[in-house]
Regions:
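A short Gly-Trp-Pro
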Residues: 2-161, 166-291
Length: 291
């Protein structure tokens, strides 16, 4: 294969801070939206989109920044220790599965189905016509891990936690708003098609455990964009902006139904080329007029 062909067949991806990058060579397989509780926790989003390729066509750069959390032998999730973006980790059957939200270009592949819809977030509705499977689709022989256990809900309190359980938080009262954001920073930070964020008054959120396990990365050139994550497992966690009096909560981190659903899509001008918005929520190229 000539150098020009090699470039054409490769897709480049990177984490939010840029310290970890990777090249993934096609052909690609099994691009899917996963709704399992573990993906939701890890990414902080309603679902995670992954794409598979042969491991010998995968090249990772910046491995020194990568942290892997392994809840049990043979199962791990990897993330950038500086910014918290999810990055490709362990291989499966000669394949590496990469989060699609980190692509710098269009891989040319499109999601084929939704998996683990039996674990779907109660605040998210699947609006497209792709096939849906309660767990893995037929023909995929892989271990099915149970969703993280949950204790009974408490009236008036919305709880959340990271995937490993080191960090937990509670929110008193209703949120201010909830939106789906498609900006490039949110896609890189969450390693997903979009972020689903909920804003709450800063003094209504409290961390009940793991406050010392939180890392916050602020994009240097951004006025206010930052990502907070668990240093142990990399899960996206609420980011508190004290000067603005708000906390931005990744809805995938919630353990209880928040009593609200995202009201609109913002920054759709930056939408991932491989993702189609199929619902009827209002769409805004950038911030909504009332922001």
């Amino acid at each position: 294969m000539g150098r020009a062909e090699w470039r054409k067949s490769m897709s480049r991806a990177s984490c939010l801070c840029g310290d970890v990058t990777w090249d993934l060579e096609g052909p690609y397989v099994f691009m899917h939206h996963c709704h399992c509780g573990r993906c939701r926790k890890a990414h902080g989003t309603p679902f995670a989109t992954y794409i598979g390729a042969a491991e010998d066509g995968f090249r990772l750069h910046g491995a020194a920044r990568v942290t892997a959390w392994a809840p049990q032998p043979g199962v791990s999730r990897s993330f950038c220790s500086r910014c918290g973006s999810i990055v490709p980790g362990a291989t499966f059957g000669g394949l590496v599965f990469a989060p699609a939200g980190n692509f710098d270009d269009d891989p040319g592949e499109r999601p084929a189905d939704h998996i683990f819809v039996a674990s779907k977030a109660p605040w998210y509705a699947i609006a497209d016509s792709l096939p849906r499977f309660d767990a893995y689709p037929p023909g995929v022989d892989a271990v099915v891990l149970p969703d993280p256990p949950r204790s009974p809900a408490r009236t008036g309190v919305t709880r959340g936690s990271c995937l490993c359980g080191a960090v937990a938080f509670e929110i008193d009262g209703p949120p201010l708003l909830a939106r789906n954001c498609h900006c490039g920073r949110c896609r890189k930070a969450r390693s997903a098609a979009h972020a689903s964020n909920m804003a709450v008054p800063a003094d209504h959120l409290r961390f009940t455990s793991g406050g010392d396990d939180l890392i916050t990365y602020k994009v240097p050139e951004a006025d206010r964009f930052a990502q907070t994550f668990c240093r142990v497992c990399g899960s996206s966690m609420p980011c508190v902006y004290r000067a603005r009096g708000i906390a931005v909560v990744p809805m995938g981190a919630l353990d209880d139904p928040p009593g609200v659903t995202p009201a609109c899509h913002i920054f759709v001008a930056s939408r991932a080329p491989w993702f189609t918005i199929a619902d009827d929520l209002p769409q805004h190229d950038e911030y909504p007029p009332d922001a």
